[in-house]
């Protein structure tokens, strides 16, 4: 059992205790971050005269070889080590001798693991941001091709007003764009370096914390050593942002599942992103969308777990905080996987435009436009609302729609209606006259698409 402590103990650690306490099975995931942090620490120690140039070169060469050997599969990370820190240090000493024993000068595992976690989270934020950007590109492509693809817009899952597919997909574009903004905010706020905080009270060595922070790409060192080793706000913020991403993916998945059903027939998911049934030969199931929807709860669970873990911990570091790793690793991997699969699925879906348009023409989605027609002819809106309600009842009675209701029936309810009512309630007119910024009208929709293109080019 390789561990970095034990001098004051008179008994061996119980095997069950060792296994319960060890974290090597999961914190090996950030071996690269651990070695990068150690390299920066060594550079700083040499700069400050705490290590000689020869010691620095030996240690740097040893750390580099460990990184390369693990990456290439020549060196296995095994359970004989308590954690990734002891694995790296033990292997370093084996390779470079006594110089390796100086690696931990001016450092505690408390600030070391805080650094590793920050480096890992920062790297993964960049990776997740890239996956969200890929999804936005796929959505933008759909928007560009469907500025005049009419479909019903819904409220309460009831047909409400006609919109376009570009406009509907654009709503999700906005959601995922905000998600990128949240990731950017988290990255900026967390970008302070905890290395040099020690166990909780700093160190007596003349460390240059600003130099270490600069080497590792941080904006500055953290400002309080106790907070440095006990801060997991950035983990909580990340899991919150990931939960929001999953919520957006889940909402979109729910719509795709409905749209893919025989009852809607708005889309057909590509065979490559569908599965079948072991008993029903006709089935083509939207399993990817369903799994994305299901995995949302998994990410929510990680957020609630870390909030619960942190709520009762006194300052500064406590072993409870080891529980943040597996939760965070799993949530990150889940979100990255869901984003990649979802992007592939939406990129290959076939939109059944004729069915969408036919659906928009049913369900009185143009009723509001009939009311607006009356308002434009001097009828107060509240009166117009009541008149169109009567028209809808008449259409239901006759089994027809506002597009095909005879003019005599219109005029029997209100003499204001004239022949031009049919143009006013056509799908084309209903959508095209909605020209306020953010509405589905083709002209303003094209403007938004150009803004989205510019956003993706610049971000």
Segments predicted by a language model, with ranges:
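A helix-coil-helix interface module used to build multimeric assemblies
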Residues: 1-202, 207-213, 220, 275-276, ...
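Glycine-rich cofactor/substrate-binding loops
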Residues: 2-37, 98-99, 280-459
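Amphipathic alpha-helices that form helix-helix packing interfaces
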Residues: 38, 66, 128, 132-135, ...
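Conserved hydrophobic residue
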Residues: 51, 75, 264-265, 380, ...
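A short structural micro-motif
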Residues: 61-69, 232, 390-394
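Short, contiguous, pocket-lining structural segments
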Residues: 127, 131, 157, 161-171, ...
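Conserved helix-loop functional segments at active or binding sites
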Residues: 145, 182-185, 189, 218-222, ...
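Acidic, glycine-rich loop-and-beta core segments that form the ion-binding/anion-interacting portion
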Residues: 216-308
